Amino acid sequence: MKRIDFTLYAITDRSFIKGMDIAEAVEIAIKNGVTVVQLREKDISSREFYEIALKVKEVTRKYNVPLIINDRVDIALAVDAEGVHVGPDDLPVGVVRRILGPDKIVGGSAYSVEEALKAEKEGADYIGAGSVFAQPVKPEAEVIGIEGVRKIKEAVNIPVVAIGGVNKTNAYEVILHSGVDGISAIAGIFDGDIEANTKDMLREIRRAFKERGK
Amino acid sequence: MKRIDFTLYAITDRSFIKGMDIAEAVEIAIKNGVTVVQLREKDISSREFYEIALKVKEVTRKYNVPLIINDRVDIALAVDAEGVHVGPDDLPVGVVRRILGPDKIVGGSAYSVEEALKAEKEGADYIGAGSVFAQPVKPEAEVIGIEGVRKIKEAVNIPVVAIGGVNKTNAYEVILHSGVDGISAIAGIFDGDIEANTKDMLREIRRAFKERGK
Ligand code: NI
């Protein structure tokens, strides 16, 4: 399960998902080409997180897409998710690797080469590098641009996904000039028409991969 | 480590712990007779919870007192705590037991005999039964009285600690009439003079144990 297709990595955010449950939204995204799903929940109880994760796991299992849980190693273990993604406010990458063992996927966030190298050294399987662009929903995030993402990609030997304000209008440029292995998106996928967002983004990513000769 | 002395089980609450850090407060409580420590944190990041838990674990390890983490199985694994306590909003007892295996302590909350039997069946090592009394800090908690706690104690074959509004003024009555194995307290220990609270409560509990012939 460690060999992952990072082309289009969707991160859930219930604030964008209206009128349907998260599992339904995830299913639309997967049907239209999302290759990895990260379930991200804040400000809910462990029991609620667990129950949502169980439902989402049913969908990802059905389509054989890896499910990554944001932050909560216990929820990942509880639903037998494929992995965990941790950022600066979460458990350190090395601690997560120790708990999960060698077979689960561990991802780390980085906005600098130094952080990315640290996460790689601690056992991360991939890096979420960003923020590429400024995001209205996350004004506190450090913006490193396509250039900052490219430096991270060049520094590490593990896959890198670009994150932060990437959508169908800029995914082509990000892939082409940063050299990353895929795009990670929240609003870019779940804000609005999930089917159209996913298809358009995937087309732009593939167009850039082709241009790069990947 | 499964053989626990549940006599006086302290649950941390930072809102009562002023002018010192949680590890210091826990050390005072342990020095004065607390036999189990539960670290309970809400509304902080996983990283902060982890860092506090590491500090508290240093103290509990020094005095050879078991450390139980409230809710977060991942934090317990990260700091190698002795166990986890889960309530109705947390992961189910059976899931926690499956993740932690047979050697860690798993505690469950119950306000009814039915819930207590369910937790026991799912693999709980002990029950936190209550609320014994109404608590201003937790107005939503179901109050079951000393009688409700006694029914739970009589129904299960695992240790029971009484929780909810128990302090030095009522611990004697609770122990004497409910037959429980110990008292669990938050405010009863950490609100005010921790040393005096702990000593007084322990004296009352022991007086009732003696009266009961335990
Ligand atoms: Ni260009």
UniProtKB/Swiss-Prot annotation, chains A, B:
The UniProt keyword set, sorted, is: Magnesium, Metal-binding, Thiamine biosynthesis, Transferase
Q: In which pathway does it act?
A: Cofactor biosynthesis; thiamine diphosphate biosynthesis; thiamine phosphate from 4-amino-2-methyl-5-diphosphomethylpyrimidine and 4-methyl-5-(2-phosphoethyl)-thiazole: step 1/1
**Gene Ontology MF, one:** magnesium ion binding
Q: Which domain of life is it from?
A: Bacteria
Q: Which BP terms from GO are recorded?
A: thiamine biosynthetic process; thiamine diphosphate biosynthetic process
Catalysis performed (reactions): 2-[(2R,5Z)-2-carboxy-4-methylthiazol-5(2H)-ylidene]ethyl phosphate + 4-amino-2-methyl-5-(diphosphooxymethyl)pyrimidine + 2 H(+) = thiamine phosphate + CO2 + diphosphate; 2-(2-carboxy-4-methylthiazol-5-yl)ethyl phosphate + 4-amino-2-methyl-5-(diphosphooxymethyl)pyrimidine + 2 H(+) = thiamine phosphate + CO2 + diphosphate; 4-methyl-5-(2-phosphooxyethyl)-thiazole + 4-amino-2-methyl-5-(diphosphooxymethyl)pyrimidine + H(+) = thiamine phosphate + diphosphate
Q: Does the keyword Metal-binding apply?
A: yes
Q: Does the keyword Oxidoreductase apply?
A: no
A Pfam match: TMP-TENI
Q: At which positions is Mg(2+) bound?
A: 71, 90
Required co-factor? Mg(2+)
Which residues of this UniProt protein bind 2-[(2R,5Z)-2-carboxy-4-methylthiazol-5(2H)-ylidene]ethyl phosphate? 165
Q: What is its EC number?
A: 2.5.1.3
Residue numbers binding 4-amino-2-methyl-5-(diphosphooxymethyl)pyrimidine: 38-42, 70, 109, 138
Please give the coiled-coil regions recorded for this protein. Answer: none
- Check the record and name the NCBIfam families matching this protein: thiE
Q: Record's family?
A: Belongs to the thiamine-phosphate synthase family.
Summary of the function given for this chain in its UniProt record: Condenses 4-methyl-5-(beta-hydroxyethyl)thiazole monophosphate (THZ-P) and 2-methyl-4-amino-5-hydroxymethyl pyrimidine pyrophosphate (HMP-PP) to form thiamine monophosphate (TMP).
Instruction: Please identify the protein, giving its name as recorded.
Output: Thiamine-phosphate synthase
What is the originating organism of this protein?
Answer: Caldanaerobacter subterraneus subsp. tengcongensis (strain DSM 15242 / JCM 11007 / NBRC 100824 / MB4) (Thermoanaerobacter tengcongensis)
